Amino acid sequence: KADVFIFLDNVKVEKSSWQMRNRLKTITNKEDGEVWFRIPTKNIHSDTKINEVIIDNSVNWKHKHKTIFENNYGEKFPDIKFLNKIYDKDWNKLVDFNIEFIEKCCEFLKIKTELKKASSLNAEGKKSNLLLNLCLELSATHYLSTIGAKNYLEKDKNLFKSNDIKIIYHEYKHPIYKQKGKKFISNLSILDLLFNENMNAVNIFNSK
């Protein structure tokens, strides 16, 4: 839906956020479950920005991730070739890993949306003011927001209205796809979709 997607990489990071960890499905003889896989980071303070977070490479996190992939998705892990290439590279900053991962997922899913980093733009401010200034810098007419930001955006909606920018809240409808196990678990990492459906993931993703 969006013409441009902006990575808010120059705002404060939240500990244990989705930037650092995600979930995949596990299957045992007894039940279906979930496993967290995370990227360890060095000291994060209250004022640390997302683009300042350093990966703690003293922990062999890439090996741990690959073990999770192989144990739960078996032979399907090598099929996602871009993932192997990402994990074969050396990474220092968390933001660089995350952005390349998202870029490669977009290529795989044939998503043509232009991607930009907020830190590469001139816009300043906090919360609604920052979002508004980013929209203005890019001459946007609409701002597509997650439903989670509605509480504070609604308080400042007149800021956007006075600048002829319409706020649209994206209510995500989770697709059902082929998944191992007895029950379907939603809202996992996009890797679950890619491992289970491979190239068919393009059709599933773009049908929503």
Describe these PLM feature segments.
Residues 1-208:
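Residues lining hydrophobic/aromatic ligand-binding pockets adjacent to catalytic sites
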